[in-house]
Amino acid sequence: MSYTGDEIHSISLKDAGALTKRYRDQFSVETPYIKGEYFGKTALLSLLSQTGCVGTRIYYGLKADDTQCLVLVGVDGDGNDMTTGEIMEVGLPCPAHCSEANDLNS
């Protein structure tokens, strides 16, 4: 399958809220977990501006201390990870770097 970078991925806030709530509901109050991560615009544009990059793939990771994280890598037009390019992980996790309460995080 080839990728162009013009694929549409939008969903409604209602659908997005249902997805994130289902994820949050699988954890108990005592179990720490990551709701999301913040990545800055400059970092994302740097990843996406690599030659041949048409999008990004986001992998779920687990750090040595068992903290969840996201790993971002550019994807080329053939759908392959651009593993010789820039790869990102150091996002700012929520919690502690959360938005005000909304349908996606509360």
What name fits each language-model region?
Residues 1-106:
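Detector for the mature cores of small, proteolytically processed
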